[in-house]
Curated annotation (Swiss-Prot):
This is Inhibin beta B chain. Keywords: Cleavage on pair of basic residues, Disulfide bond, Glycoprotein, Growth factor, Hormone, Secreted, Signal. The lineage of its organism: Eukaryota, Metazoa, Chordata, Craniata, Vertebrata. Inhibins and activins inhibit and activate, respectively, the secretion of follitropin by the pituitary gland. Inhibins/activins are involved in regulating a number of diverse functions such as hypothalamic and pituitary hormone secretion, gonadal hormone secretion, germ cell development and maturation, erythroid differentiation, insulin secretion, nerve cell survival, embryonic axial development or bone growth, depending on their subunit composition. Inhibins appear to oppose the functions of activins. Residues 1-25 form the signal peptide.
Length: 391
C-alpha cells in the first residue's frame, strides 16, 4: 500500500470515528461529477449495480443489528415450542395482547413502529417464564423456572409475581360457606437444603381461577447473585380437605401451567437529541428519512419473535449542502451501526462531506422467545429512525 492510499484509509477511519462520536465533520466540496452520497460513507442509500446482493447484505445487517440490540449472539434455536395454550393464557392474563383466529398474537403497541407519546426514560423489560417440576405431590410441589438474564445486564426488579391456577373439584359445602386455603411458597437454595418462606397467602375461593403471589424480593436476590434458576416449594394447606387442586405441570392442563412474570428496569438512560426532519417523497434530494419495512416472516424469524410482525428499519439519505451542515445527530442508531458497515466497502474514502444521519430515534417494543423458551417483552431504545439531519 503506497503512502497516498494509506493516508486515504486513515482519513476514512478518522471520519468514521468522528461520526460515531456525533461530531460534526467539516464540509468538503465533492469532486466534479459526483454526488454527496458518493463521497460520504454514511450519506444516503446508494443503489448499487447488484441490488439483489446488497439486499441480502442489508437484511443480514438488519439481523445483526436486532440481535445486538437484544444483546444476543445468535437467534434462539427453537427446537420445541412452549405449549401454545400456556403462552396464550399468559399473554391474555397479562393483557399484553389478544390472539387472532389464525393463532397469531396481536399487540397494539407492538406493530413495529414507535409507540405514541413521549419516549420512556426507563425502559422496562417483561419476562414470562413457565414452570417445570421435579416432583408431583398432591399438596407440595417443587417448581423451577429458568429466567432470562437479559444479556447479563444489571437489572432492578420493578415487580415480580407467580401466577398459580387453583381448580375447584366437586365438593359438598354447607350453605353460605366457602373454601379457604393457605398457599405457602418457599425459596429453595439449590446448593443446600435450606429454604425460606417467600410468601404466604390466604385464598378465599368461590370458583376456579388464577391467583398471584408477589415474588419481587426473591427475584431481585436471584439476579444479584447472578443466578438464573429459581427453585420454589409450593404448599397448599387445606387443598385436600376442601377438594382444591392446584394446577402445576400437567400435560392435560397446559393452559393452566404456572408462570412467573418479572418486570425489570435497566439503570442506564440516554437522552435523545431531537430535530424535525424531512420525509423522502421522491421530490427532494435533501437529507430525509426513507422508510424501509422488513417482514419477519420473510427472513424466517417469525418462529421466535412473537410480536411485532416486522421492523421499520428506516434510514437517512440525501444531500447535505453547506448551509445544512453542523446539525448535531446521534450515532447510536440503525443508520450508523448497520448501514455504514457494508456501504463503506465500495466507496472512496478520500474525501468527507457533511452527512445525513439520524437526529431522532425511538423505542421499539418486542415480544420474543429467548434460549430458555422464556417469553420476553422488552422495550428496546434507539431502534427506529424517526428524523434525519446533517452533521
Amino acid at each position: 500500500m503506497d503512502g497516498a492510499a494509506r493516508r486515504g484509509v486513515l482519513a476514512a477511519l478518522l471520519a468514521c470515528g468522528l461520526l460515531l462520536l456525533g461530531a460534526a465533520a467539516t464540509p468538503t466540496p465533492p469532486p466534479a461529477g459526483s454526488s454527496p452520497q458518493d463521497t460520504c460513507t454514511s450519506c444516503g442509500f446508494r443503489r448499487p449495480e447488484e441490488p439483489g446482493k446488497v439486499d441480502g447484505d442489508f437484511l443480514e445487517a438488519v439481523k445483526r443489528h436486532i440481535l445486538s440490540r437484544l444483546q444476543m449472539r445468535d437467534r434462539p434455536n427453537i427446537t420445541h415450542a412452549v405449549p401454545k395454550a400456556a403462552m396464550v393464557t399468559a399473554l391474555r392474563k397479562l393483557h399484553a395482547g389478544k390472539v387472532r383466529e389464525d393463532g397469531r398474537v396481536e399487540i397494539p403497541s407492538l406493530d413495529g413502529q414507535a409507540s405514541a407519546g413521549p419516549p420512556a426514560h426507563d425502559p422496562v423489560s417483561e419476562i414470562i417464564s413457565f414452570a417445570e417440576t421435579d416432583d408431583l405431590a398432591s399438596s407440595r410441589v417443587r417448581l423451577y423456572f429458568f429466567i432470562s438474564n437479559e444479556g447479563n445486564q444489571n437489572l432492578f426488579v420493578v415487580q415480580a409475581s407467580l401466577w398459580l391456577y387453583l381448580k375447584l373439584l366437586p365438593y359438598v359445602l354447607e350453605k353460605g360457606s366457602r373454601r379457604k386455603v393457605r398457599v405457602k411458597v418457599y425459596f429453595q437454595d439449590p446448593d443446600t437444603s435450606n429454604k425460606w418462606n417467600v410468601v404466604e397467602k390466604k385464598v378465599d375461593l368461590k370458583r376456579s381461577g388464577w391467583h398471584t403471589f408477589p415474588m419481587t424480593e426473591a427475584i431481585q436476590a436471584l439476579f444479584e447473585r447472578g443466578e438464573r434458576r429459581l427453585n420454589l416449594d409450593v404448599q397448599c394447606e387445606g387443598c385436600e380437605e376442601y377438594s382444591v387442586l392446584p394446577i402445576y405441570v400437567d400435560p392435560g392442563e397446559e393452559s393452566h401451567r404456572p408462570f412467573l412474570v418479572v418486570q425489570a428496569r435497566l439503570a442506564d438512560n440516554k437522552h435523545r437529541i431531537r430535530k424535525r426532519g424531512l420525509e423522502c417523497d421522491g421530490r427532494t434530494n435533501l437529507c430525509c428519512r426513507q422508510q424501509f419495512y422488513i417482514d419477519f416472516r420473510l427472513i424466517g424469524w417469525n418462529d421466535w419473535i412473537i410480536a411485532p410482525s416486522g421492523y421499520y428499519g428506516n434510514y437517512c439519505e440525501g444531500s447535505c449542502p453547506a448551509y445544512l451542515a453542523g446539525v448535531p445527530g446521534s450515532a447510536s442508531s440503525f443508520h450508523t451501526a448497520v448501514v455504514n458497515q457494508y456501504r463503506m466497502r465500495g466507496l472512496n474514502p478520500g474525501t468527507v462531506n457533511s452527512c445525513c444521519i439520524p437526529t431522532k430515534l425511538s423505542t421499539m417494543s418486542m415480544l420474543y422467545f429467548d434460549d430458555e423458551y422464556n417469553i420476553v417483552k422488552r422495550d428496546v431504545p434507539n431502534m427506529i429512525v424517526e428524523e434525519c439531519g446533517c452533521a
